[in-house]
């Protein structure tokens, strides 16, 4: 346990601290979010995911300090499954620090202050912080229950803002700061301040102001898609795709991002990050589609680059000749369209494919040409795919590294 519940009238708490035997200046953490289990079938699927994630993380944990951050929606309005989730997530074999999500709140209670009581009984405080090397981690609750049926907004209350201000006053300016919360601060640079939004944080500007003296990374979930927003040279948000992907009905998220987790490698006050599709090697960072795969773009080669930001480069080659960079566009991922097309299987109408802005297109001169897509991430790592016909069924066949 990393916390002790305080009891009224008790003045003394005895506990033993365990020394970290590894140098935490170099450490690694995985970010999972929106596990959202609501039945035994979901728990079984999550158990399978946990086994794969553990197998991948073991090589890092042998050499470095390693842990897990869970960005909320642990369950799907089913707090009775907290003990089962705890048991299954223990299979990761790493310490897990959790963040409350909107589906983890108690509904029907009289105020926001009562909405997180059951969560705290199982997982401890809704906001806290800790250090690893030259990195400072802040865990927040920005799911603000407004006591109308199942209504909530993204909002950080004044009590928490005052605590953040005091907390950061103790953090050296040259240390990295990671802020973990469930609802994104903003999904675009066009921040909608002071709007009552359930999918963004209405007073995010107050948080940004507190972070202005630090290099900070916001890490969030909630949307069930993957995306990055670079606000400026010192502030960036990473919105992480869902573990439950298509609500356990599909292993693709609605934007075409495969089920997986964020991987962050910290060295001093420097950090590198990747998205790890749980069923594929780390080198699988995008999916290319041949012309004819999309009804929206029938003539185009497409590439869905799920962890893209402005410092990535997406190029394409026709018969070995570099044709330049592909054009970013907004559209539907073809495999996601196929995966979500079985409406009977999907159930709810809102479980569907949604347009993404990390899609890229190009029109080949020769439809029979050999087309390759080459993607370079912000850290200089290059990924390449030969374009061929791809379907959701094909993706679920778990392509080998050679295929990619």
Where are these regions (language model features)?
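Extended active-site neighborhood of metal-dependent phosphoesterases/phosphodiesterases
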Residues: 79-173, 194-219, 228-267
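Aromatic sugar-binding surface patches on proteins
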Residues: 334-361
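Short acidic, glycine-rich surface-loop motifs adjacent to enzyme active sites
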Residues: 171-189
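Short, surface-exposed loop motifs enriched in S/T, G, D/E and P with embedded aromatic residues
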Residues: 321-336, 348
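N-terminal active-site segment of His-dependent metallophosphoesterases
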Residues: 3-82, 367, 395
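Active-site glycine-centered loops adjacent to acidic/histidine catalytic or metal-binding residues
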Residues: 34, 72-73, 101-102, 182, ...
């Amino acid at each position: 346990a990393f916390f002790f519940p305080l009891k009224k009238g008790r003045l003394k708490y005895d506990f033993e601290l365990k020394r970290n035997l590894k140098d935490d200046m170099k450490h690694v953490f995985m970010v999972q979010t929106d596990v959202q289990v609501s039945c035994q079938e979901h728990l079984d699927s999550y158990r399978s995911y946990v086994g794969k994630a553990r197998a991948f993380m073991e090589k890092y944990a042998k050499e470095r300090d390693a842990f897990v951050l869970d960005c909320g929606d642990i369950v799907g309005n089913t707090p009775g499954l907290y003990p089962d989730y705890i048991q299954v997530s223990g299979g990761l074999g790493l310490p897990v620090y959790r963040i409350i999500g909107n589906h983890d709140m108690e509904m029907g209670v009289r105020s926001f202050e009562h909405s997180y009581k059951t969560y705290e009984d199982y997982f401890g405080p809704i906001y806290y912080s800790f250090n690893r090397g030259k990195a400072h981690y802040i865990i927040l609750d920005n799911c603000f229950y407004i006591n109308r049926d199942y209504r909530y907004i993204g909002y950080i209350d004044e009590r928490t803002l005052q605590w953040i201000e005091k907390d950061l006053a103790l953090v050296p300016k040259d240390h990295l700061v990671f802020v973990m919360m469930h609802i994104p601060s903003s999904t675009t640079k066009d921040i909608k301040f002071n709007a009552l939004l359930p999918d963004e944080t209405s007073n995010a500007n107050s948080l940004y102001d507190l972070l202005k003296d630090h290099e900070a990374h916001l890490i969030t979930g909630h949307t069930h898609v993957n995306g990055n927003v670079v606000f400026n040279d010192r502030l960036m948000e990473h919105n992480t795709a869902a573990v439950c992907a298509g609500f356990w009905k599909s292993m693709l998220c609605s934007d075409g991002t495969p089920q997986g987790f964020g991987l962050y490698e910290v060295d001093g006050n420097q950090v590198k990050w990747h998205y790890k599709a749980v069923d594929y090697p780390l080198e699988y960072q995008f999916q290319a589609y041949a012309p004819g795969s999309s009804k929206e773009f029938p003539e185009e080669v497409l590439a869905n680059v799920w962890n893209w930001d402005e410092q990535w480069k997406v190029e394409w080659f026709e018969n070995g000749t570099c044709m330049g960079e592909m054009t970013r566009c907004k559209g539907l991922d073809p495999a996601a369209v196929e995966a979500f097309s079985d409406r009977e299987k999907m159930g709810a109408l809102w479980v569907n494919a949604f347009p993404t802005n990390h899609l890229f297109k190009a029109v080949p001169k020769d439809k029979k040409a050999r087309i390759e897509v080459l993607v370079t991430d912000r850290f200089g790592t290059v990924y390449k795919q030969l374009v061929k016909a791809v379907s959701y069924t094909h993706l679920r066949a778990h392509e080998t590294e050679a295929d990619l």
